[in-house]
Amino acid sequence: MSELLSVALFLASVLVYAWKAGRNTWWFAATLTVLGLFVILNITRYASDYFTGDGINDAVLYTLTNSLTGAGVGKYILPGIGIVLALVGVFGALGWILRRRRHHPHHVGYSLLALLLALGSVDASPAFRQITELVKSQTRDGDPDFAVYYKEPAKTIPNPKLNLVYIYGESLERTYFDNDAFPNLTPELGALKNEGLDFSHTMQLPGTDYTIAGMVASQCGIPLFAPFEGNASASVSSFFPQNICLGDILKNAGYQNYFVQGANLRFAGKDVFLKSHGFDHLYGAEELKTVVTDPSYRNDWGFYDDTVLDEAWKKFEALSRSGQRFSLFTLTVDTHHPDGFISRTCNRKRYDYDSKPNQSFSAVSCSQENIARFINKIKASPWFKDTVIVVSSDHLAMNNTAWKYLNKQDRNNLFFILRGDKPQQETLAVKRNTMDNGATVLDILGGDNFIGLGRSSLSGQSLSEVFLNVKEKVLAMKPDIVRLWNFPKEMKAFTIDQDKNMIAFSGSHFRLPLLLRVSDKRVEPLPESEYSAPLRFQLADFAPRDNFVWVDRCYKMAQLWAPELALSTDWCVSQGQLGGQQTVQHVDKTQWKGKTAFKDTVIDMQRYKGNVDTLKIVDNDIRYKADSFIFNVAGAPEEVKQFSGISRPETWGRWSNAQLGDEVKIEYKAPLPKKFDLVITAKAFGDNANRPIPVRVGNEEQTLVLGHDVSTTTLHFNNPTDASTLVIAPPVPVSTNEGNILGHSPRKLGIGMVEIKVVNAES
């Protein structure tokens, strides 16, 4: 209703001004500005909806002010371009319509009415309400109800008798199990759901709407609100260190806690969270690749669900045979947005909706089959009688190819329980949320019936029942929850540990690299993650007088303030103000100690603008002074005009990537010498090893042969045509996720380049 009202007010404002107001520059500018704000707000809302499926929420607040990288980002480029073009088109059309009757006499009354209608359209829009609530959540000091409802459970379970298997289904919300809406989509897992305790109204709250946030909510009974973006949690050394979570209680009660997933454990700090809260046995992509049958059978995120659940079954069987008390948590990935992935062992590889195949529905149908197969193995085993199986979604599905169909339904998270000791078949329609999951499980295992803000749905009352406005209530508690991190409020002295790649100050530890905004009463950490912008881009958003401490590889800050370190991959510390003075210090000891020293200098806006512009230079446009192309740092030598077909820098160098160009091309600003030696230090990937690799300059071609290990080869070239471009053509680029950023599409690797040097051989 609010959305319809806002649109009606918007159209009324346009019509009144266009047909009645007449000509006046000030009123035209004011009305166009407010109407333009309405357009921007709503396009922002729909763009956010595209990524999250939930409009402008806490999860996208960080992303809206930083670059989006990571999971399948290429699939969002086209929609992003469409949004920008639509915005330009709407503004142009709006200005043209408002000026239609500019030659008519001005009428103050109608101009005022049009402006008031425009302001009303903004105020009534859902986008404005969402942003207003988010801003309030950032500025509140907390909510007195937090102290009333936040409860710390006992740290152990007396006489535990049941093992626990907890399955997180990636985005596998309960809505998919509506057989009337989606016939025969989830028959295997749906049948198991109907055999157990099925909680049909599990809502999603702010701060619980992405994977690591859903895990924190379900185990600690709190949303993931932090002084940084939640998916950047990999940079912290401990995770809600003061909280007692489900894993802590299980460990104290004698459980061995296991976690198995197909993706890298470091992503979003899952390893930090789990290690901080009772899990000693963690298995992700790195740990599984040495034990799975086919290490190359992977999707963009890691190992497929059938592989992961097979490994989970092996763990369950071995642990059950050992007789020790255990919990086994596992997380699937095949249903990850935007499209999902199909395991090769599935019988259900295709699901049609609206008379055409739908990839997301197909991935759901396949994944639920794999989960059901895993559960049925447990049920058929002699150990089921001592086991509780929990199946839940980590969060509601984000914007995938099934999302518009899901939105037509009443959406809820999945949460059901199968008890081997005491079979119960019941659908419970009690209002609840994912923070109640851990407390419900703890209650069944014989512990307390509360964890944090979560309550057992079997014997307690959820916040979703207590508060009609539970989403607003949780947002109001955000400052209270952030305080649970116990983050430092000042930074004076700090220590960098090069062996551990950590920085420590005021009792806190963070992984490197790290950017910090330091004020009198607050230290704001800005880690680098798969979803955040590089730290230099984040620093470019600082105000001229903001104090910063930036710890990163030297070459990343060298182009600004230390050109002599342009090729150094050591750690450096920079501090200062973008509009004032900055220093760069080379970290030259294993345990390097430093102090903050911010000078109260006059702000130079010209210097500030220059620093910001330099920070925003993209990697491929960076240039440094060197007599060779060094591939483990960003950019290229000053002599290089442009290059293509080359992937990002890694610690050792860079791969060629046929996704970025069929050949490696390096174009120099000036013609290459008439006669020169080309010294190439490189290695080959996969089948490119020990095969002839053509290297061309102008009309002349030489052959390069590389092995799997790095070697140096010198090729001799004549260049009578004054060619300026070097071309290397790997013969068989291999599609692989080797060394890939989690969630990115596979690269097509050919050769790995460490250094290329042109040596003039003219006499």
UniProtKB/Swiss-Prot annotation:
Pathway: Glycan metabolism; osmoregulated periplasmic glucan (OPG) biosynthesis. Its EC number is 2.7.8.20. One of its GO terms (biological process) is glucan biosynthetic process. GO terms for cellular component: plasma membrane. The chain crosses the membrane at residues 1-21, 24-44, 77-97, 108-128. It is a multi-pass membrane protein. GO terms for molecular function: phosphatidylglycerol-membrane-oligosaccharide glycerophosphotransferase activity. Belongs to the OpgB family. PANTHER family: LIPOTEICHOIC ACID SYNTHASE, PHOSPHOGLYCEROL TRANSFERASE I. This is Phosphoglycerol transferase I. It comes from Salmonella arizonae (strain ATCC BAA-731 / CDC346-86 / RSK2980). The lineage of its organism: Bacteria, Pseudomonadati, Pseudomonadota, Gammaproteobacteria, Enterobacterales.
